[in-house]
Amino acid sequence: NKLDIINQTDILLSVTSIPDKKIIESSKENLIVVGTFNPYENKKSLQSLAFKKINVLSLDLLPRISRAQSMDVLSSQANLAGYKAVILASNLFRKAFPMMMTAAGTIIPAKCLILGAGVAGLQAIATAKRLGCVVTAFDVRPEVEEQVKSLGAKFIKVDDSDSTVKENSVYAKEMTEEYKLKQKAKIHESAKDMDIIITTAMIPGKKAPILVESKTIREMKLGSVIVDLAGSSGGNTEGMKSGEEIIIDN
């Protein structure tokens, strides 16, 4: 029985989810739980663990420095998420990804837009390119343009002369309202012609920014696929529901 095993456990490892109520009630005091629990968003759930006198080590708060690199679970999970997002999109997409030249004619390659060029985004770019897509990417950090282009993708530029965010960072940060308007216009212009959109943009401790609006979705081609990896933080796509597949008749 799972609960009997939990009752005898001293250290419990979890990947992405906080142990449910039954597990918490079955565990003994001073249990050590290690995993990624997003404490910014799950404060109440973590308080219930503290009430039970359970010790929680949330590895997503580890500093992203070289000494802690071997324990950087965020990067390893994001890497897998970026890869899986493209594979999932290819399964849902009704056509082939690469260009195919046959006796019956030529099939043009699928167009893929990656929003957010962090660890997940860069892996999504690399995977989509390997599968034969024409890839375009966007990120609020202009310094990642070189990384995006090194993977063979195009980079969408937004004039950020009025932005207060200039320094190098591994995380995206809050932008000015004026920048957000320019950003949405650029993304809308590119996204409506795409076959695949994968969104990965998140801001630590805050709700994920809406990058793909309803009007953009309505103008996209029939059969297009959006995979939103920011669902746990509210999503980058307007109207999305975390963990659910939604079919929109546009």
What is the meaning of each model-derived region?
Residues 1-7, 17-18, 165-197, 201-218:
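A structured beta-alpha segment of the ubiquitous adenosine-cofactor-binding alpha/beta core
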Residues 4-6, 25-28, 104-108, 127, ...:
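Solvent-exposed alpha-helices and their adjacent loops that cap or buttress functional pockets
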Residues 10, 16-17, 37-38, 202-203, ...:
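Short glycine-/small-residue-rich Rossmann-like dinucleotide-binding loops
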Residues 24-111:
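Glycine/serine-rich phosphate-binding loop and adjoining beta1-alpha1 elements at the start
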Residues 39-68, 206-250:
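Rossmann-fold NAD(P)-binding glycine/threonine-rich loop
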Residues 46, 86, 124-125, 145, ...:
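Generic hydrophobic/aromatic pocket-lining and core-packing "Φ" positions
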Residues 98-190:
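Glycine-rich phosphate/diphosphate-binding loop of Rossmann-like nucleotide-binding domains
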